[in-house]
Swiss-Prot record:
This is Steroid 17-alpha-hydroxylase/17,20 lyase. Regulated predominantly by intracellular cAMP levels. The 17,20-lyase activity is stimulated by cytochrome b5, which acts as an allosteric effector increasing the Vmax of the lyase activity. GO terms for biological process: glucocorticoid biosynthetic process; hormone biosynthetic process; progesterone metabolic process; steroid metabolic process. Belongs to the cytochrome P450 family. It comes from Ovis aries. It holds the Pfam family p450.
Amino acid sequence: MWVLLAVFLLTLAYLFWPKTKHSGAKYPRSLPSLPLVGSLPFLPRRGQQHENFFKLQEKYGPIYSFRLGSKTTVMIGHHQLAREVLLKKGKEFSGRPKVATLDILSDNQKGIAFADHGAHWQLHRKLVLNAFALFKDGNLKLEKIINQEANVLCDFLATQHGQSIDLSEPLSLAVTNIISFICFNFSFKNEDPALKAIQNVNDGILEVLGKEVLLDIFPALKIFPSKAMEKMKGCVETRNELLSEILEKCQENFTSDSITNLLHILMQAKVNADNNNTGPEQDSKLLSNRHMLATIADIFGAGVETTTSVIKWIVAYLLHHPSLKKRIQDSIDQNIGFNRTPTISDRNRLVLLEATIREVLRIRPVAPMLIPHKAIIDSSIGDLTIDKGTDVVVNLWALHHNEKEWQQPDLFMPERFLDPTGTQLISPSLSYLPFGAGPRSCVGEMLARQELFLFMSRLLQRFNLEIPDDGKLPSLEGNPSLVLQIKPFKVKIEVRQAWKEAQAEGSTS
Protein backbone atom coordinates (compact mmCIF):
# COMPACT_ATOMS: atom_id res chain seq x y z
CA MET A 1 0.00 0.00 0.00
CA TRP A 2 2.79 2.43 0.94
CA VAL A 3 4.55 1.66 -2.33
CA LEU A 4 1.38 2.49 -4.28
CA LEU A 5 0.93 5.72 -2.31
CA ALA A 6 4.53 6.71 -3.00
CA VAL A 7 4.10 6.02 -6.72
CA PHE A 8 0.86 8.05 -6.73
CA LEU A 9 2.51 11.03 -5.02
CA LEU A 10 5.53 10.89 -7.33
CA THR A 11 3.20 10.82 -10.33
CA LEU A 12 1.34 13.86 -9.03
CA ALA A 13 4.61 15.66 -8.40
CA TYR A 14 5.74 14.93 -11.96
CA LEU A 15 2.45 16.11 -13.46
CA PHE A 16 2.05 19.26 -11.40
CA TRP A 17 5.63 20.39 -10.75
CA PRO A 18 6.41 23.47 -12.88
CA LYS A 19 8.06 22.37 -16.11
CA THR A 20 11.43 23.71 -17.24
CA LYS A 21 11.04 26.65 -19.60
CA HIS A 22 13.03 27.33 -22.76
CA SER A 23 16.51 28.57 -21.91
CA GLY A 24 16.93 32.31 -22.43
CA ALA A 25 13.26 32.88 -23.24
CA LYS A 26 11.41 35.82 -21.70
CA TYR A 27 8.03 34.85 -20.27
CA PRO A 28 5.14 36.89 -18.86
CA ARG A 29 5.52 37.82 -15.22
CA SER A 30 3.91 35.12 -13.08
CA LEU A 31 1.96 34.95 -9.86
CA PRO A 32 3.67 32.82 -7.19
CA SER A 33 3.19 29.10 -7.71
CA LEU A 34 3.42 26.00 -5.52
CA PRO A 35 3.71 22.34 -6.51
CA LEU A 36 0.37 20.58 -7.05
CA VAL A 37 -1.87 23.61 -6.40
CA GLY A 38 -0.05 26.13 -8.58
CA SER A 39 -1.13 29.75 -8.04
CA LEU A 40 -4.49 28.86 -6.53
CA PRO A 41 -3.62 30.08 -2.99
CA PHE A 42 -2.52 33.45 -4.40
CA LEU A 43 -5.61 34.23 -6.48
CA PRO A 44 -8.31 36.48 -4.96
CA ARG A 45 -11.21 34.38 -3.70
CA ARG A 46 -13.89 37.01 -3.21
CA GLY A 47 -15.67 39.19 -5.73
CA GLN A 48 -16.03 38.63 -9.45
CA GLN A 49 -13.22 36.91 -11.32
CA HIS A 50 -12.98 39.35 -14.21
CA GLU A 51 -12.66 42.27 -11.78
CA ASN A 52 -10.10 40.42 -9.67
CA PHE A 53 -7.94 39.64 -12.69
CA PHE A 54 -8.24 43.28 -13.77
CA LYS A 55 -7.00 44.45 -10.36
CA LEU A 56 -4.03 42.09 -10.58
CA GLN A 57 -2.84 44.15 -13.56
CA GLU A 58 -1.93 46.92 -11.11
CA LYS A 59 0.85 44.67 -9.78
CA TYR A 60 1.69 42.41 -12.71
CA GLY A 61 0.93 44.55 -15.77
CA PRO A 62 -1.38 43.99 -18.78
CA ILE A 63 -0.02 40.49 -19.44
CA TYR A 64 0.80 38.00 -16.71
CA SER A 65 0.54 34.30 -16.04
CA PHE A 66 -0.52 31.92 -13.31
CA ARG A 67 -0.70 28.17 -12.84
CA LEU A 68 -3.74 26.10 -11.95
CA GLY A 69 -2.78 22.49 -11.37
CA SER A 70 -0.50 21.55 -14.24
CA LYS A 71 -1.73 24.25 -16.63
CA THR A 72 -0.20 27.66 -17.30
CA THR A 73 -2.65 30.40 -18.20
CA VAL A 74 -1.71 33.81 -19.60
CA MET A 75 -4.12 36.67 -18.87
CA ILE A 76 -4.38 39.51 -21.38
CA GLY A 77 -5.73 42.91 -20.30
CA HIS A 78 -4.79 45.38 -23.05
CA HIS A 79 -6.30 45.78 -26.50
CA GLN A 80 -2.99 45.76 -28.40
CA LEU A 81 -2.04 42.42 -26.90
CA ALA A 82 -5.59 41.11 -27.30
CA ARG A 83 -5.65 42.03 -30.98
CA GLU A 84 -2.30 40.32 -31.48
CA VAL A 85 -3.72 37.11 -29.97
CA LEU A 86 -7.12 37.26 -31.67
CA LEU A 87 -6.26 38.78 -35.05
CA LYS A 88 -2.57 39.04 -35.95
CA LYS A 89 -1.80 35.57 -34.58
CA GLY A 90 -5.36 34.30 -34.50
CA LYS A 91 -4.49 30.95 -36.04
CA GLU A 92 -1.59 30.34 -33.65
CA PHE A 93 -3.91 30.91 -30.68
CA SER A 94 -7.03 29.27 -32.13
CA GLY A 95 -6.94 26.18 -29.93
CA ARG A 96 -9.25 25.46 -27.01
CA PRO A 97 -8.07 23.85 -23.75
CA LYS A 98 -9.64 20.67 -22.42
CA VAL A 99 -11.80 21.55 -19.42
CA ALA A 100 -13.82 18.89 -17.61
CA THR A 101 -17.14 20.76 -17.46
CA LEU A 102 -16.86 22.06 -21.02
CA ASP A 103 -15.91 18.60 -22.31
CA ILE A 104 -19.23 17.30 -20.99
CA LEU A 105 -21.08 20.29 -22.42
CA SER A 106 -19.49 19.83 -25.86
CA ASP A 107 -19.46 16.00 -25.99
CA ASN A 108 -15.67 15.95 -25.78
CA GLN A 109 -14.93 19.10 -27.79
CA LYS A 110 -17.42 18.67 -30.60
CA GLY A 111 -19.40 21.64 -31.94
CA ILE A 112 -17.69 24.97 -32.55
CA ALA A 113 -17.61 27.00 -29.31
CA PHE A 114 -15.38 24.69 -27.25
CA ALA A 115 -13.86 22.52 -29.98
CA ASP A 116 -10.08 22.51 -30.29
CA HIS A 117 -8.46 23.73 -33.49
CA GLY A 118 -8.66 21.11 -36.21
CA ALA A 119 -10.60 19.75 -39.17
CA HIS A 120 -13.82 19.29 -37.20
CA TRP A 121 -13.92 22.86 -35.87
CA GLN A 122 -12.97 24.38 -39.22
CA LEU A 123 -15.63 22.39 -41.08
CA HIS A 124 -18.47 23.08 -38.67
CA ARG A 125 -17.66 26.78 -38.32
CA LYS A 126 -17.67 27.08 -42.12
CA LEU A 127 -21.04 25.30 -42.34
CA VAL A 128 -22.57 27.51 -39.63
CA LEU A 129 -21.45 30.62 -41.52
CA ASN A 130 -22.96 29.13 -44.69
CA ALA A 131 -26.23 28.67 -42.81
CA PHE A 132 -26.32 32.32 -41.74
CA ALA A 133 -25.83 33.25 -45.39
CA LEU A 134 -29.20 31.60 -46.12
CA PHE A 135 -30.92 34.33 -44.11
CA LYS A 136 -29.75 37.39 -46.04
CA ASP A 137 -32.68 37.78 -48.42
CA GLY A 138 -36.25 36.79 -49.25
CA ASN A 139 -38.66 34.96 -46.99
CA LEU A 140 -35.76 33.68 -44.89
CA LYS A 141 -34.33 37.16 -44.33
CA LEU A 142 -33.04 37.47 -40.78
CA GLU A 143 -34.72 40.81 -40.20
CA LYS A 144 -38.11 39.36 -41.13
CA ILE A 145 -37.69 36.46 -38.70
CA ILE A 146 -36.66 38.77 -35.86
CA ASN A 147 -39.59 41.09 -36.57
CA GLN A 148 -42.05 38.19 -36.42
CA GLU A 149 -40.88 37.29 -32.93
CA ALA A 150 -40.71 40.95 -31.88
CA ASN A 151 -44.37 41.27 -32.92
CA VAL A 152 -45.34 38.27 -30.80
CA LEU A 153 -43.39 39.65 -27.85
CA CYS A 154 -44.96 43.11 -28.13
CA ASP A 155 -48.47 41.67 -28.48
CA PHE A 156 -47.91 39.68 -25.28
CA LEU A 157 -46.54 42.70 -23.42
CA ALA A 158 -49.60 44.72 -24.48
CA THR A 159 -51.71 42.28 -22.44
CA GLN A 160 -49.55 43.13 -19.41
CA HIS A 161 -50.38 46.86 -19.48
CA GLY A 162 -50.03 48.32 -16.00
CA GLN A 163 -48.35 45.18 -14.64
CA SER A 164 -44.82 44.78 -13.31
CA ILE A 165 -43.22 41.67 -14.79
CA ASP A 166 -39.90 39.90 -15.19
CA LEU A 167 -39.02 40.02 -18.89
CA SER A 168 -36.88 36.87 -18.76
CA GLU A 169 -39.42 34.29 -19.95
CA PRO A 170 -41.08 36.24 -22.79
CA LEU A 171 -37.69 37.44 -24.03
CA SER A 172 -36.24 33.95 -23.84
CA LEU A 173 -39.17 32.56 -25.84
CA ALA A 174 -38.72 35.18 -28.55
CA VAL A 175 -34.97 34.68 -28.88
CA THR A 176 -35.24 30.88 -28.63
CA ASN A 177 -37.70 30.88 -31.52
CA ILE A 178 -35.35 32.95 -33.67
CA ILE A 179 -32.53 30.47 -33.03
CA SER A 180 -34.89 27.53 -33.53
CA PHE A 181 -36.02 28.89 -36.89
CA ILE A 182 -32.41 29.32 -38.02
CA CYS A 183 -31.60 25.76 -36.94
CA PHE A 184 -34.82 23.94 -37.86
CA ASN A 185 -37.41 26.36 -39.39
CA PHE A 186 -39.38 25.51 -36.27
CA SER A 187 -40.94 27.68 -33.54
CA PHE A 188 -42.11 26.80 -30.03
CA LYS A 189 -45.43 27.81 -28.55
CA ASN A 190 -45.46 29.57 -25.21
CA GLU A 191 -47.04 26.60 -23.43
CA ASP A 192 -44.77 24.00 -25.07
CA PRO A 193 -43.18 21.90 -22.28
CA ALA A 194 -40.06 21.47 -24.44
CA LEU A 195 -39.50 25.23 -24.30
CA LYS A 196 -39.57 25.27 -20.51
CA ALA A 197 -37.25 22.26 -20.47
CA ILE A 198 -34.75 24.07 -22.71
CA GLN A 199 -34.87 27.14 -20.45
CA ASN A 200 -34.29 24.96 -17.37
CA VAL A 201 -31.37 23.24 -19.08
CA ASN A 202 -29.75 26.57 -19.99
CA ASP A 203 -30.20 27.83 -16.43
CA GLY A 204 -28.66 24.65 -15.03
CA ILE A 205 -25.67 24.78 -17.36
CA LEU A 206 -24.98 28.43 -16.54
CA GLU A 207 -25.29 27.68 -12.82
CA VAL A 208 -22.55 25.04 -13.07
CA LEU A 209 -20.34 27.24 -15.25
CA GLY A 210 -20.70 30.03 -12.69
CA LYS A 211 -19.08 27.90 -9.99
CA GLU A 212 -15.46 26.98 -9.42
CA VAL A 213 -15.27 23.28 -10.22
CA LEU A 214 -12.11 21.68 -8.79
CA LEU A 215 -12.20 19.01 -11.47
CA ASP A 216 -11.56 21.72 -14.07
CA ILE A 217 -8.30 22.50 -12.27
CA PHE A 218 -7.37 18.99 -11.14
CA PRO A 219 -8.65 16.43 -13.69
CA ALA A 220 -7.24 13.58 -11.58
CA LEU A 221 -10.10 14.20 -9.14
CA LYS A 222 -12.56 12.67 -11.62
CA ILE A 223 -12.41 9.45 -9.59
CA PHE A 224 -14.38 11.23 -6.87
CA PRO A 225 -18.10 12.14 -7.03
CA SER A 226 -18.94 15.72 -8.04
CA LYS A 227 -22.39 17.28 -7.70
CA ALA A 228 -21.52 19.96 -10.25
CA MET A 229 -20.43 17.39 -12.82
CA GLU A 230 -23.50 15.25 -12.23
CA LYS A 231 -25.72 18.31 -12.71
CA MET A 232 -23.92 19.21 -15.92
CA LYS A 233 -24.31 15.64 -17.22
CA GLY A 234 -28.02 15.68 -16.41
CA CYS A 235 -28.57 19.02 -18.15
CA VAL A 236 -26.66 17.92 -21.25
CA GLU A 237 -28.53 14.62 -21.39
CA THR A 238 -31.89 16.41 -21.24
CA ARG A 239 -30.78 18.95 -23.85
CA ASN A 240 -29.58 16.24 -26.20
CA GLU A 241 -32.83 14.29 -25.87
CA LEU A 242 -34.87 17.38 -26.77
CA LEU A 243 -32.71 18.37 -29.73
CA SER A 244 -32.32 14.77 -30.95
CA GLU A 245 -36.08 14.40 -31.25
CA ILE A 246 -36.27 17.50 -33.45
CA LEU A 247 -33.19 16.42 -35.42
CA GLU A 248 -34.63 13.00 -36.21
CA LYS A 249 -37.92 14.48 -37.44
CA CYS A 250 -36.03 16.86 -39.72
CA GLN A 251 -33.90 14.03 -41.08
CA GLU A 252 -37.01 12.02 -42.00
CA ASN A 253 -38.30 14.86 -44.19
CA PHE A 254 -34.97 16.06 -45.59
CA THR A 255 -34.43 16.49 -49.32
CA SER A 256 -31.52 18.16 -51.04
CA ASP A 257 -33.97 20.23 -53.11
CA SER A 258 -34.85 22.51 -50.20
CA ILE A 259 -32.00 23.78 -47.99
CA THR A 260 -33.53 26.32 -45.61
CA ASN A 261 -31.81 25.98 -42.22
CA LEU A 262 -28.61 25.05 -40.40
CA LEU A 263 -29.54 21.41 -39.96
CA HIS A 264 -30.21 21.11 -43.70
CA ILE A 265 -26.74 22.55 -44.36
CA LEU A 266 -25.16 19.98 -42.02
CA MET A 267 -27.17 17.08 -43.48
CA GLN A 268 -26.38 18.08 -47.06
CA ALA A 269 -22.68 18.25 -46.17
CA LYS A 270 -22.92 14.68 -44.86
CA VAL A 271 -24.69 13.51 -48.04
CA ASN A 272 -21.94 15.10 -50.12
CA ALA A 273 -19.23 13.50 -47.99
CA ASP A 274 -20.89 10.07 -48.12
CA ASN A 275 -21.01 10.34 -51.93
CA ASN A 276 -17.40 11.55 -52.14
CA ASN A 277 -18.77 14.74 -53.67
CA THR A 278 -16.55 17.04 -51.66
CA GLY A 279 -12.99 17.81 -50.63
CA PRO A 280 -10.89 15.64 -48.29
CA GLU A 281 -11.42 18.06 -45.40
CA GLN A 282 -15.15 17.22 -45.31
CA ASP A 283 -14.88 13.78 -43.70
CA SER A 284 -18.23 12.04 -43.20
CA LYS A 285 -17.08 10.97 -39.73
CA LEU A 286 -17.10 14.63 -38.69
CA LEU A 287 -20.78 14.90 -39.61
CA SER A 288 -22.29 12.20 -37.42
CA ASN A 289 -25.51 12.92 -35.54
CA ARG A 290 -23.46 13.58 -32.41
CA HIS A 291 -21.34 16.15 -34.23
CA MET A 292 -24.43 17.83 -35.69
CA LEU A 293 -26.13 17.81 -32.30
CA ALA A 294 -23.14 19.46 -30.63
CA THR A 295 -23.06 22.26 -33.20
CA ILE A 296 -26.81 22.86 -32.95
CA ALA A 297 -26.50 22.88 -29.15
CA ASP A 298 -23.72 25.48 -29.37
CA ILE A 299 -25.91 27.77 -31.44
CA PHE A 300 -28.75 27.44 -28.93
CA GLY A 301 -26.43 27.84 -25.96
CA ALA A 302 -24.59 30.85 -27.33
CA GLY A 303 -27.53 32.48 -29.06
CA VAL A 304 -30.29 32.55 -26.46
CA GLU A 305 -28.94 33.51 -23.04
CA THR A 306 -26.46 36.05 -24.41
CA THR A 307 -29.00 38.12 -26.35
CA THR A 308 -31.65 37.79 -23.64
CA SER A 309 -29.17 38.98 -21.01
CA VAL A 310 -28.04 42.00 -23.03
CA ILE A 311 -31.63 43.14 -23.67
CA LYS A 312 -32.33 42.93 -19.94
CA TRP A 313 -29.16 44.92 -19.20
CA ILE A 314 -30.29 47.61 -21.67
CA VAL A 315 -33.73 47.83 -20.04
CA ALA A 316 -32.12 48.00 -16.59
CA TYR A 317 -29.84 50.88 -17.57
CA LEU A 318 -32.77 52.74 -19.13
CA LEU A 319 -34.70 52.39 -15.87
CA HIS A 320 -31.72 53.97 -14.13
CA HIS A 321 -31.58 56.73 -16.78
CA PRO A 322 -35.19 57.76 -17.58
CA SER A 323 -34.14 60.96 -19.36
CA LEU A 324 -32.05 58.91 -21.79
CA LYS A 325 -35.02 56.61 -22.41
CA LYS A 326 -37.20 59.67 -23.15
CA ARG A 327 -34.63 61.04 -25.62
CA ILE A 328 -34.48 57.69 -27.44
CA GLN A 329 -38.27 57.56 -27.67
CA ASP A 330 -38.37 61.14 -28.97
CA SER A 331 -35.89 60.09 -31.66
CA ILE A 332 -38.07 57.10 -32.59
CA ASP A 333 -41.18 59.30 -32.74
CA GLN A 334 -39.47 61.87 -34.97
CA ASN A 335 -37.67 59.48 -37.32
CA ILE A 336 -40.01 56.48 -37.45
CA GLY A 337 -43.36 57.55 -36.06
CA PHE A 338 -46.09 55.00 -35.39
CA ASN A 339 -47.21 54.01 -38.88
CA ARG A 340 -44.34 51.63 -39.56
CA THR A 341 -41.99 49.43 -37.61
CA PRO A 342 -38.26 50.18 -37.30
CA THR A 343 -35.89 48.42 -39.68
CA ILE A 344 -32.18 47.70 -39.60
CA SER A 345 -31.64 50.58 -42.03
CA ASP A 346 -32.93 52.91 -39.28
CA ARG A 347 -29.77 52.41 -37.22
CA ASN A 348 -28.26 55.51 -38.80
CA ARG A 349 -31.39 57.47 -37.85
CA LEU A 350 -31.68 56.15 -34.30
CA VAL A 351 -28.06 56.77 -33.40
CA LEU A 352 -28.73 57.39 -29.70
CA LEU A 353 -30.36 53.97 -29.36
CA GLU A 354 -27.50 52.30 -31.20
CA ALA A 355 -24.97 54.18 -29.03
CA THR A 356 -26.84 53.00 -25.93
CA ILE A 357 -26.66 49.38 -27.09
CA ARG A 358 -22.92 49.72 -27.74
CA GLU A 359 -22.34 51.31 -24.33
CA VAL A 360 -24.19 48.48 -22.57
CA LEU A 361 -21.99 45.97 -24.45
CA ARG A 362 -18.98 47.92 -23.19
CA ILE A 363 -19.87 48.47 -19.55
CA ARG A 364 -21.44 45.02 -19.07
CA PRO A 365 -19.83 42.75 -21.70
CA VAL A 366 -21.86 39.60 -22.16
CA ALA A 367 -18.67 37.52 -21.77
CA PRO A 368 -16.42 39.54 -19.44
CA MET A 369 -13.64 37.03 -20.06
CA LEU A 370 -13.55 35.46 -23.51
CA ILE A 371 -13.60 31.66 -23.75
CA PRO A 372 -9.96 30.56 -23.23
CA HIS A 373 -7.74 30.19 -26.26
CA LYS A 374 -4.77 27.83 -26.49
CA ALA A 375 -1.46 28.19 -28.30
CA ILE A 376 -1.30 25.42 -30.90
CA ILE A 377 2.40 26.13 -31.60
CA ASP A 378 5.26 27.85 -29.77
CA SER A 379 4.51 31.54 -30.24
CA SER A 380 4.83 34.95 -28.63
CA ILE A 381 2.79 37.91 -27.45
CA GLY A 382 4.68 41.16 -27.76
CA ASP A 383 8.27 40.26 -26.87
CA LEU A 384 7.22 37.47 -24.50
CA THR A 385 7.46 33.75 -25.23
CA ILE A 386 4.30 31.64 -25.13
CA ASP A 387 4.87 27.88 -25.18
CA LYS A 388 2.69 25.51 -27.18
CA GLY A 389 -0.25 24.33 -25.08
CA THR A 390 -0.44 27.48 -22.96
CA ASP A 391 -3.96 28.74 -22.27
CA VAL A 392 -4.56 32.41 -23.10
CA VAL A 393 -7.53 34.37 -21.76
CA VAL A 394 -8.55 37.84 -22.94
CA ASN A 395 -10.07 39.81 -20.06
CA LEU A 396 -12.65 41.81 -21.99
CA TRP A 397 -13.69 43.55 -18.78
CA ALA A 398 -10.17 45.00 -18.49
CA LEU A 399 -10.26 46.24 -22.10
CA HIS A 400 -13.67 47.86 -21.63
CA HIS A 401 -12.78 49.51 -18.30
CA ASN A 402 -9.29 50.81 -19.05
CA GLU A 403 -9.09 54.42 -17.79
CA LYS A 404 -6.47 55.25 -20.42
CA GLU A 405 -8.91 54.26 -23.18
CA TRP A 406 -12.24 55.29 -21.69
CA GLN A 407 -13.03 58.48 -19.80
CA GLN A 408 -14.66 57.51 -16.49
CA PRO A 409 -15.14 53.89 -17.63
CA ASP A 410 -17.44 52.98 -14.74
CA LEU A 411 -19.98 55.61 -15.78
CA PHE A 412 -22.74 54.77 -18.24
CA MET A 413 -22.23 57.26 -21.09
CA PRO A 414 -23.75 56.31 -24.48
CA GLU A 415 -22.57 59.67 -25.83
CA ARG A 416 -19.02 58.32 -25.96
CA PHE A 417 -20.10 56.44 -29.13
CA LEU A 418 -21.37 59.64 -30.80
CA ASP A 419 -19.55 62.53 -32.45
CA PRO A 420 -19.70 66.00 -30.81
CA THR A 421 -22.88 66.84 -32.75
CA GLY A 422 -24.61 63.70 -31.47
CA THR A 423 -25.68 62.78 -35.00
CA GLN A 424 -23.01 60.28 -36.10
CA LEU A 425 -21.86 57.01 -34.59
CA ILE A 426 -18.12 56.73 -33.93
CA SER A 427 -15.64 54.12 -32.69
CA PRO A 428 -13.97 55.93 -29.78
CA SER A 429 -11.37 53.28 -28.93
CA LEU A 430 -9.73 50.12 -30.23
CA SER A 431 -10.22 48.74 -26.71
CA TYR A 432 -13.71 47.51 -27.62
CA LEU A 433 -14.28 43.91 -28.66
CA PRO A 434 -17.74 42.87 -27.42
CA PHE A 435 -17.91 39.91 -29.81
CA GLY A 436 -14.25 38.97 -29.81
CA ALA A 437 -12.31 39.03 -33.09
CA GLY A 438 -10.47 36.82 -35.53
CA PRO A 439 -10.94 33.10 -36.28
CA ARG A 440 -12.69 32.51 -32.95
CA SER A 441 -14.98 35.54 -33.08
CA CYS A 442 -18.69 35.11 -32.38
CA VAL A 443 -20.34 33.58 -35.47
CA GLY A 444 -23.66 35.13 -34.45
CA GLU A 445 -22.48 38.74 -34.16
CA MET A 446 -24.62 40.00 -37.05
CA LEU A 447 -27.68 38.20 -35.67
CA ALA A 448 -27.13 39.56 -32.16
CA ARG A 449 -26.66 43.15 -33.32
CA GLN A 450 -29.86 42.99 -35.37
CA GLU A 451 -31.81 41.42 -32.51
CA LEU A 452 -30.70 44.05 -30.01
CA PHE A 453 -31.59 46.97 -32.26
CA LEU A 454 -34.90 45.63 -33.56
CA PHE A 455 -36.18 44.41 -30.19
CA MET A 456 -35.26 47.60 -28.34
CA SER A 457 -36.58 49.95 -31.03
CA ARG A 458 -39.88 48.05 -31.14
CA LEU A 459 -40.23 47.97 -27.35
CA LEU A 460 -39.54 51.68 -26.96
CA GLN A 461 -41.80 52.58 -29.88
CA ARG A 462 -44.79 50.86 -28.27
CA PHE A 463 -44.15 50.89 -24.53
CA ASN A 464 -43.05 52.97 -21.62
CA LEU A 465 -40.81 50.74 -19.54
CA GLU A 466 -41.11 52.06 -16.01
CA ILE A 467 -39.85 51.39 -12.50
CA PRO A 468 -42.31 49.11 -10.64
CA ASP A 469 -44.71 50.68 -8.15
CA ASP A 470 -42.53 49.48 -5.26
CA GLY A 471 -39.80 51.80 -6.59
CA LYS A 472 -37.19 49.01 -6.74
CA LEU A 473 -34.52 49.62 -9.36
CA PRO A 474 -32.59 46.70 -10.85
CA SER A 475 -29.17 45.92 -9.45
CA LEU A 476 -26.37 46.70 -11.88
CA GLU A 477 -24.08 44.12 -10.29
CA GLY A 478 -24.09 41.01 -12.44
CA ASN A 479 -24.08 37.31 -11.63
CA PRO A 480 -20.80 36.02 -13.09
CA SER A 481 -20.81 32.89 -15.23
CA LEU A 482 -19.80 32.17 -18.80
CA VAL A 483 -22.37 34.93 -19.44
CA LEU A 484 -22.60 38.05 -17.23
CA GLN A 485 -26.24 37.77 -16.20
CA ILE A 486 -28.23 40.52 -14.55
CA LYS A 487 -29.97 39.69 -11.28
CA PRO A 488 -33.75 39.16 -11.66
CA PHE A 489 -35.80 42.36 -11.71
CA LYS A 490 -39.24 43.58 -12.72
CA VAL A 491 -40.29 46.36 -15.05
CA LYS A 492 -43.70 48.03 -15.29
CA ILE A 493 -45.22 47.76 -18.77
CA GLU A 494 -47.32 50.67 -20.03
CA VAL A 495 -48.57 50.97 -23.60
CA ARG A 496 -47.64 54.44 -24.80
CA GLN A 497 -50.57 56.82 -25.21
CA ALA A 498 -49.16 58.10 -28.50
CA TRP A 499 -49.09 54.53 -29.81
CA LYS A 500 -52.70 53.96 -28.76
CA GLU A 501 -53.84 57.15 -30.48
CA ALA A 502 -51.95 56.30 -33.68
CA GLN A 503 -53.49 52.82 -33.79
CA ALA A 504 -56.98 54.22 -33.16
CA GLU A 505 -56.53 56.79 -35.92
CA GLY A 506 -55.26 54.12 -38.30
CA SER A 507 -58.23 51.85 -37.65
CA THR A 508 -60.74 54.63 -38.49
CA SER A 509 -59.02 55.97 -41.58
